[in-house]
């Protein structure tokens, strides 16, 4: 699942950059910029859907990756496991700041 995580991360970064090129964060025009992305940008609706569903798939892959590590006893490698826990917290914090707060 590590390679799927890398593929999801690259997809999220690329679609996020392309969506950010057309998005306006101003409160009066944010909704119209999303409508502009979906209607006027070539394959904008597809980029938006890939970005939204890719985030869910990314977290599913993370949890499957952690579950596989727990099943095979990888938690015995303390340093590696602790780095993974720190990365999990960073990913959750990034998702909170990027998706929940706005």
UniProtKB/Swiss-Prot annotation:
Which GO BP terms, alphabetically? mitochondrial electron transport, ubiquinol to cytochrome c
Q: Which InterPro entries match?
A: Cyt_b/b6_N, Cytb/b6-like_sf, Di-haem_cyt_TM
Which GO CC annotations does the UniProt entry carry?
Answer: mitochondrial inner membrane
Instruction: State its location(s).
Output: Mitochondrion inner membrane
The transmembrane residues are 1-21, 45-66, 81-101
Question: What further note is attached to this protein's record?
Answer: Heme 1 (or BL or b562) is low-potential and absorbs at about 562 nm, and heme 2 (or BH or b566) is high-potential and absorbs at about 566 nm.
Q: What does this protein do?
A: Component of the ubiquinol-cytochrome c reductase complex (complex III or cytochrome b-c1 complex) that is part of the mitochondrial respiratory chain. The b-c1 complex mediates electron transfer from ubiquinol to cytochrome c. Contributes to the generation of a proton gradient across the mitochondrial membrane that is then used for ATP synthesis.
Q: What is this protein called?
A: Cytochrome b
Q: Which organism does this record belong to? A: Ambystoma tigrinum (Eastern tiger salamander)
């Amino acid at each position: 699942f590590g390679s799927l995580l890398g593929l999801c991360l690259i997809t999220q970064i690329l679609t996020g950059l392309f969506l950010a090129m057309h998005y306006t964060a101003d409160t009066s025009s944010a909704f119209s910029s999303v409508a502009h992305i979906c209607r006027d940008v070539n394959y904008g609706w597809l980029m938006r859907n890939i970005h939204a569903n890719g985030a869910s798939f990314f977290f599913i892959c993370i949890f499957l990756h952690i579950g596989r590590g727990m099943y095979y006893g990888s938690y015995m490698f303390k340093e590696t496991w602790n780095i993974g826990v720190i990365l999990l917290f960073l990913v959750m914090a990034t998702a909170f700041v990027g998706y929940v707060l706005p």
